[in-house]
Every structure is written in C-alpha cells, then in structure tokens.
Curated annotation (Swiss-Prot):
Oligomeric and partner information: May form a heterodimer with gbb-1.
Family: Belongs to the G-protein coupled receptor 3 family.
Domain comment, as recorded: Alpha-helical parts of the C-terminal intracellular region may mediate heterodimeric interaction with gbb-1.
Official protein name in the record: Gamma-aminobutyric acid type B receptor subunit 2
Length: 842
C-alpha cells in the first residue's frame, strides 16, 4: 500500500511541476514493468523525424522524475506514411498486439488522425496528437465523434482567441475577413472566429470575402468590396499560396501601408513571401506584406529560465532537442506530449496497479504543469497553450505579442511596438459645422454699424435743413426713404452673419424671414426712391410739351408704393406657401488620411424657395434695367438741386453692378460660408455706402458752402443749361451734298421754333405773376428775379397771340418771332431780367 501511495505522491508532484533547486524525493531504479506506448510517425522525405524529441522526453521521464516508479514506457513506433490505409493498418496492428498499448502518441496527418480517432473511442484508448491543428477536432460534435482524442498543440480555439484579444487590445470595432471556402481547415475556424468577435467582443464584421481556387479571378472583386466598405483591419484564413494571391491583389488596389492591417495565419515559414507571384514581383509582395501580422502557436516558451517538468531549465531542454533535430517544428510539443501521457499514466494507476482508460482521460483533462511549450493545460480535450503574434518587419518576422490560453492572458512585447502605430479601423467621420469666422463677423458688423451711424447723420442733416433751398429742391422726403432703405440693408448684413452659436434653431427660423424681408424691402426703398427721382428728371427733360404738368413727390411715392406692394405680396405668399425651416446641409466630404471631414452648413430651407427667389430677382432685374436706361437717358442733365446732379445715375449703376456680383457670388459660393458672407457683405456695404455718399455728400458740401441758400442764380443756370443741352442736340447728319443755303435755312427754321416756344412760356409765366399780384401774394413777388421785372408789353402780348394763329397766305406756319421794341432793341422785361440767368420754375 505504501508503494502505491508513494507513486501517487510522485504523480501529483509531476502534475504540479518542480520549483528551482528541488531534488527528487525518490531513488530511481532501472528496469520495471513495461508499458507499451504506440507512436505514429511519418518517416519519409518532407516530414520531420519525431523520434529524437520523443526519446529525449522519455529519457527525462525515467531519469528526472519520480513518476511511473517501477514501470518503463516502451515505444511501439508505426509509420503511417500520411495515408489513411497505412494508418488504419498500423492501428489494427497495435490493437492486435499483446499487451495493447496504454495510449497512442501521434499522428501528424489529419487524414490519418480522423479515422483512427473515431475508431479508438470503441477501445477507449487515448490518442494524443502533437501536430493536429484542424478545426474539425474542436467542433461542437467533436467530443462525441472523437471521444478519446486529445492534442497537445494549441488549435484554432487558441489562435482565434489570440486574434480576438489582439483586435480588442487596439480598440478596433470594424473588421473585414477573408476565408478560403474550399479548405475546411481554414473555413471552419473562420466561422468560429467571426462568431466570437461579434458576440464575445462586440466587433462588427463588415464583410466576409470568400475565395477559392476554382474562382480565383473573384479575389480582386472581393477585395474591392472590402475597400468600398472602408475596411482597414482584415483577418485572413487561407493557405500560403492563397495568402500570396490575396496580398498581391490587395497591393494593386492600394490596400497596404500604414492605414491597413493584415492578420494572417502563421505558417512557421516566410518562404511564400519571397516567391514571385504571377501578378506581383518579389519587391511588390514585400511591400504588400509590410507590417502584416501572423498568428501561430508558439514553438516554445519565451521565459527560457523557468524550471519545467523534470526540474530542468526550459532553455536547456530546448537547446538539447534542437541540436538533435533543428528542423522539426513540433519538437517542443513532442516533448510535452510524452510528459503529458507519462503523468496521466501515473495518475490512472489504481491501488491494485490496474490501468484505467477513463482515469487516464480524466487525468489529461486535469493536467496542469509547466512544459517546454508553456503551461500544459487542457479543456474539452483541447490544449490551452501559447500563441505567438509576429509582425513582418525589415524582411523577417519579429515577436509582437503573445497570448497564453492557460491563463487567458494577452501581452504586448513592448520592444517590438516601436516604429509602428495601430491605424484606425475605419475612416473616422468628423462632422464639422461650418460657421462664419467670428473675426469676420465682427468686422463686417462693425462696418455695417458705421454705415447705419452714417445714414443716421445724413438723416439728421436732411431733416435739420429740410427748408434749405438746395435740400428742398432735391425732394428731401425721397432722400429720407433712401436713408431708411440703406439702414435696412446695413442691418441685413448683421443678421446674415447670425447662426445657432448665438441664437437657438427656433429663433434662427424667424431670423430667416427677418433678413430676407429686411434686405428685399431695404433694396426696394433705396433703389426705388432713386429710380423715382431719375424717372422724374427723365420726364422733365425728355418730354418738353406745351401742356406738361408738374410731377410732384406724391406721384413718386405712388411708384415706390407699387414696388413695395409687389415685394410684400411675394414675401407674404412665400411665407404661407413655403415657410422656412432650419436645416443642416452636408457639403462634399474632405478626406484626410484616416479622417473624412463632413462639412455642414446651416441653411434656411424652403421647398419652393427657388420659385419665389426667381420672381423677386425678375422684379428687381426689370427695375434695375429700367433704372440703367433712365440713368443713361439723363446723362446730360446736370442740375445739382433737382436730381442730385449725375450722382443718382452713378448710384444706379453702382447698385446694379454690386447686386449682380453679390447675387452671383452668393449662388456660386453658397457652400463656402466665410467667402460668401464676406463678399456678399462687402457688396451690400460698399454699394449702400457709396449711394449714401453720392446722394448726400454733395448736399453737405453745399450746406457748408452756402448755409443760407441765397444763390438762386447758380441753381437756375444749371437748369437752363440742361434744357438747352437737351433741346439743342444736333440734328441727324445730312449728306454732304446739301448746300450751305439749305443748312442755313434749316437752322433758321429750328431757331424760330425754339424762340417761339420760349416766348410762349415767358408769356404764361408773366400771366401767372399778374394773377399773384392781383391776389396780393407779395411773398412770391419778393423773389429776386421778380422784383426788377415788369409785365410784358402790350406789343409782346399781341405778338404772342399772333404766334398762336397760323398764317394762311401760303398754307404753312409763318411766325413773327421778334421780341424787340419799336426801335429794334430787345425789351428790358423780355422774358427774364437777365437772359443769361434762366429761372428754374419751368
């Protein structure tokens, strides 16, 4: 009994491992009862030799531990040739042998392991593979199909978890995947990977690209889909040759570099990267593969100084088996696999030394010791081991991170993170609200306020000196309208720059109405008043008739009222039919590396705004065209007091040009808020200020020069010059064949007609003067031009009557146009005191 207790104690010690400096508590004896152990290998070219590592492990089990005291493991090696038939024959040979093997270590090929594992469950014989990584042995029904099958090498469960931890470590939440449909070795673990990413880590699988060799031409299209969906992190589960094809296709689509991360399976080789592809050179392949990651099971543990099972440094054991077979990828798992079986065998021995397969499977599942490939631990027949994550850098793989499945720990190797920074999992969409620059808004608002202040000064002057002769003759009421309209347009500049940084969205909607109405009505008031004044000047100097009536300000206000009525009708209809609403409009995206900026602008939205804007533009356009026409027609008029000289015409031209430019820039630059606001504000402020200055600065100068307004001769001189300039425009050019006599005759005829017209007007003037004198109106008679004048002579009255009667002698109008006295001299009271100083009271 004590013998078996000692054996159990040794087994427990082996399972728990040995600490540094600990010596064996038993004395090993050579020989013992043989325990047959089946070993499946592949002994042919291209496959590594498994026996050196197994023999080393077997030697350490018997010489460096107290387990299996009194027993000796004997290997029964069978070559399966990596063929199903040979493998099954080897299995039957082992089953037929006596005694039967207590367990089987191996094999390496899936096509051999699968039927053997399915058969061994009927004999309850444990099979521990050192090289099987196929995902079918970790599926949901694998425990039922392969009850006694274990593998000491980490499978897809570990590599998938390592990939998930890797993705989660960098905070990537959007990934794309590529799987090889025609290879279950890669397709099955890929499905488990995507499920775990989505449900275990909250990572969105944007798109899974399926590739296979039968439809190899579709690889490019699948990658195009990934690129179109802005996938930056790509997990790939394909074989080596397909991996080269995928990377080559990605290279031609620009899916490489610092903005992309390719996570590939680990093949424990880099030869596939140094081969020339059909569509890529070696240099292109290296460029495409730069900084990609590989995820593969670790060949050995990194902490080489750790004492492992057998009370030996891990580094020493690794060097020992590497010297024996340096090209065997599985040498570490061969070593740990034999130790796993030895420890499980020692634990499965009962008190009566009877072997139990059930206890052995239970012992393997409960194993936990420090091995050459890390901590050896199993869960559901699966090894929970180490997984290396390596990065391709400078033509070689360098360690980047490690995942320990036994302790579920993920660790980045700090020294390898230099020179690389994790990219974003997608292009970041940054919504940037485009607001008018605060400095620009303040500057334009200040200019607008200065303009309003200037307009108020002009309004004060216009009101203060409204009875001044110069101000009174320039229609001060209309000038006040021009000032009111200018104040509205200046105010619209300030309202144009307000946004939701200052006001709420609800107030912004009302602001949409306010600035539209203010600008529209302000333009109509200012331009309409100037248009009315220009029309009156045009009517006076281009429509000289005998029965012409005076055009009073009331008629001009009627014109202005009609224009305002049209605006109000359109604006009110607009407000009811298509009201404004607050909207945020996206502008064209601006890509910047991993960031896409989406500019947004705040707008006053109206479903039918285009229609109403077109109506307003049409009305204003017609008004401006007519204004330009009238300004051109009155270009020769130069009466400062009556039509503000040529300044009104200049203002009309300025308003037209600035309005066209402002409208054009507002439409073209409506997506560039700063440029649009600055130009629109400039045009409004410039044109409005220029109009105010052209209309009122000459008045201010005249007030400074003549505060009393007692120089009527200067006012009358301008009017007479304008009349003469208009009525004495040269006749149309005549052919050079006309004789001098004909030209003189035509000139005399025209002179007679004009002199008759002047005489008639003079007679009418004096008739009115006599009526005023008869009524006792002395204020009018005290005017300077009237004090020294006398009533026209009786001869002149008779002459005037004769001028109204046509001559019948030769059926044509003959007129005696003489204003001379009996002695042939001009009467002193004809029709002005000074013929060179005409009156403005036409």
């Amino acid at each position: 009994m004590s013998r078996w207790l000692s054996l159990l104690l040794f087994a427990v010690q082996a399972v728990g491992g040995y600490e540094a400096g600990e010596e064996l508590s038993c004395k090993r004896r050579h020989g013992g009862i043989p325990l047959p152990l089946g070993v499946f290998t592949v002994q042919k070219e291209g496959f590594p030799d498994a026996l050196p590592a197994i023999r080393t492990a077997l030697s350490h089990v018997h010489s460096r531990s107290c387990i299996l005291q009194g027993y000796r493991l004997e290997m029964i090696v069978k070559d399966t040739h990596c063929k199903t038939s040979q493998g099954m024959k080897a299995l039957f040979d082992l089953i037929a042998s006596r005694p039967r093997p207590v367990a089987i270590l191996g094999g390496q090929c899936t096509e051999v392991n699968e039927p053997i594992a399915m058969a061994l469950k009927y004999w309850q014989i444990v099979q521990l593979s050192y090289a099987e990584t196929h995902a079918k042995f970790a599926s949901s029904d694998s425990h039922e199909l392969f009850t006694t099958f274990f593998r000491v090498v980490p499978g897809s469960r570990n590599t998938n978890m390592a990939k998930c931890k890797f993705v989660n470590h960098f905070g990537w939440k959007r990934v794309g995947t590529v799987k090889q449909n025609d290879q279950p070795r890669y397709a099955l673990p890929h499905e488990a990977l995507t499920t775990r990413l989505e449900h275990g880590f909250g990572v969105k699988i944007v798109h899974t690209a399926g590739v296979n060799w039968e439809q190899i031409e579709t690889v490019g299209g699948e990658l195009d889909e990934l690129k179109e969906r802005d996938v930056r992190i790509i997990l790939v589960d394909v074989d080596e040759e397909m991996a080269a094809t995928v990377l080559c296709a990605g290279y031609h689509r620009g899916m490489y570099g610092d903005n992309y991360v390719w996570i590939l399976p680990g093949y424990h080789s880099d030869k596939w990267l140094n081969q020339t592809h059909d569509n890529c050179t070696v240099e292109e392949m290296r460029e495409a593969a730069k900084n990609h990651f590989s995820v593969e099971f670790a060949l050995t543990r990194r902490d080489v100084d750790t004492k492992i099972v057998g009370n030996t440094r891990a580094g020493d054991v690794w060097n020992e088996i590497t010297q024996l077979d340096p090209n065997n990828t599985w040498r570490g798992y061969l070593y740990d696999g034999l130790w796993t079986l030895a420890i499980a065998l020692s634990h499965s021995m009962g008190d009566n030394a009877e072997f139990s397969h059930h206890k052995m499977m239970e012992a393997i599942d409960n194993s936990s010791f420090q091995g050459l490939t890390g901590k050896v631990k199993f869960a559901n027949n699966e090894r929970l081991g180490l997984v290396d994550i390596k990065q391709w850098s400078d033509g070689q793989y360098v360690p980047f991170a490690v995942y320990d499945g036994a302790d579920d720990e993920f660790k980045i190797i700090d020294s390898t993170t230099k020179g690389w920074s994790p990219p974003l999992d997608s292009t970041i969409t940054e919504r940037r609200r485009e607001h008018i620059s605060s400095i620009l808004f303040l500057a334009m608002s200040l200019l607008a306020l200065i303009g309003i202040f200037l307009a108020l000064i002009f309004l004060l002057i216009n009101f203060r000196y409204r009875n001044h002769r110069f101000i009174k003759m320039s229609s001060p009421n209309l000038n006040n309208i021009i000032i009111a309209g200018s104040i509205c347009t200046f105010a619209s500049v300030i309202m144009l720059g307000l946004d939701t940084r200052i006001v709420s969205p609800d107030v912004f909607v009302w602001l949409c109405y306010t600035k539209t109405w203010t600008l529209c009505i302000g333009f109509t008031l200012s331009f309409g008043a100037m248009f009315s004044k220009t029309w009156r000047v045009h009517s006076i100097f281009t429509n000289i008739r005998m029965d012409r009536k005076a055009i009073k300000d009331s008629k001009l206000f009627i014109i202005l009222g009609i224009l305002l009525f049209i605006d109000i009708c359109v604006l009110v209809t607009w407000a009811f039919v298509s009201p404004f609403s607050y909207t945020v409009t996206e502008l064209p995206h601006i890509p910047e590396d991993n960031i896409v900026i989406i500019p947004e602008v705040e707008k006053c939205n109206s479903s039918h705004s285009g229609v109403f804007q077109a109506v307003l533009y049409a009305v204003k356009g017609v008004l401006m065209i007519l204004g330009c026409f009238l300004a051109w027609e009155t270009r020769h008029v130069n009466v400062p007091a009556l039509n503000d000289s040529k300044y009104i015409g200049t203002s009309v031209y300025c308003c037209v040009v600035m309005s066209v430019l402002g409208l054009s820039t507002s439409v073209i630059l409506q997506e560039r808020v700063n440029e649009m606001f600055s130009l629109a504000s400039f045009f409004v402020i410039f044109s409005t200020t220029l109009t105010l200055c052209l209309v009122f600065v000459p008045k201010v100068i005249e007030l400074a020069r003549n505060p009393v307004g007692n120089e009527p001769r200067a006012y009358r001189r301008g009017l007479m010059k304008s009349v003469v300039a208009k009525t004495s425009q040269p006749m149309s050019p005549q052919p050079r064949s006309d004789s001098s006599g004909d030209l003189i005759g035509k000139a005399e005829s025209e002179n007679k007609l004009r002199r008759r017209y002047l005489h008639q007007k003079s007679t009418q003037l004096w008739d009115l003067v006599e009526k005023l004198r008869a009524q006792g109106d002395t204020r009018f008679l005290q005017q300077e031009w009237c004090l020294s004048s006398a009533s026209p002579s009786s001869q002149e009255r008779e002459t005037s009557l004769l001028l109204r009667q046509p001559s019948s002698s030769n059926n044509r109008e003959e007129t005696s146009l003489t204003a001379a006295g009996p002695n042939g001299e001009r009467s002193s009271d004809w029709p002005w005191v000074d013929p060179d100083e005409p009156s403005t009271k036409l």
